[in-house]
Regions:
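Extended terminal accessory/targeting regions
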Residues: 1-120
Length: 120
């Protein structure tokens, strides 16, 4: 499929539900690349795109049957906070930060909210 790094931003429905990233990752089960790319905002360029371990910044709600649903607003806000240094910052190339910010920010704009700026 596509290359690694930031996953192209897309518009989707959004949700204000409480966020549980671990549960949503678990619900993905053994999903393949096309499903994983719908749930996350970044993929390791050297990783296996068919494994969850190659992905970061999950922000979509995932049903128990593995269906990727709306982008979760809290997850998008948290992801941008990590890009800006929260929880030790993001362990991704500096050149990928803007693309991930754009992806997460688009979902927040879909929800009618303005994302925090990306800090240098």
């Amino acid at each position: 499929m596509a290359k690694g790094g930031p996953i192209r931003s897309h518009s989707t429905e959004t949700s204000e539900s409480p966020w549980n990233g671990s549960r949503n990752e678990k619900n993905l089960g053994d999903a393949g690349e096309s499903t994983l790319r719908r749930a996350y905002a970044w993929v390791e360029p050297e990783g296996d795109p068919n494994t969850k371990s190659a992905y970061k910044f999950i922000h979509h709600e995932v049903t128990k049957d593995g269906t990727v649903g709306p982008a979760n607003e809290r997850a998008a806000v948290n992801g941008i906070a990590v890009l800006n240094g929260a929880r030790g910052g993001a362990d991704i190339p500096a050149s990928d930060r803007k693309g991930v910010h754009n992806h997460l920010g688009r979902h927040l704009r879909d929800a009618g909210k303005e994302p925090a700026d990306l800090k240098p």
